[in-house]
């Protein structure tokens, strides 16, 4: 991460702000956890490390998508890397469409 230029940091900050606003506006996320895990690249015989960032929106209250309720049972704590219940393809598509609509507005 130390190799990221000042201009790249500014661009990244703008993307982070926009994505957080989207998640808070569209799904009422209370906050977002961000992570950058570089060690996975070194599992390969010829690693090609690059900046790879994950965002995990966190929710105090359940979120309803297409009538299905999703709860963040570990809100306020570290989350497990194991998914307790996968999101359906239909709900995943609804999330994508709603976020895309907000980001393009």
List PLM regions with ranges.
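HIT superfamily nucleotide-processing domains
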Residues: 1-105
């Amino acid at each position: 991460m130390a190799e990221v230029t000042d201009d790249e940091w500014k661009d990244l900050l703008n993307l982070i702000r926009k994505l957080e606003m989207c998640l808070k506006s569209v799904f009422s996320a209370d906050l977002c956890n961000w992570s950058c895990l570089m060690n996975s690249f070194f599992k390969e015989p010829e690693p090609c490390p690059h900046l790879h960032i994950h965002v995990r929106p966190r929710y105090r209250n359940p979120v309803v998508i297409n009538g299905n309720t999703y709860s963040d049972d570990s809100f306020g704590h570290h989350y497990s890397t194991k998914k307790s219940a996968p999101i359906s393809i239909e709900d995943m598509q609804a999330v994508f469409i709603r976020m895309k609509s907000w980001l393009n507005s």
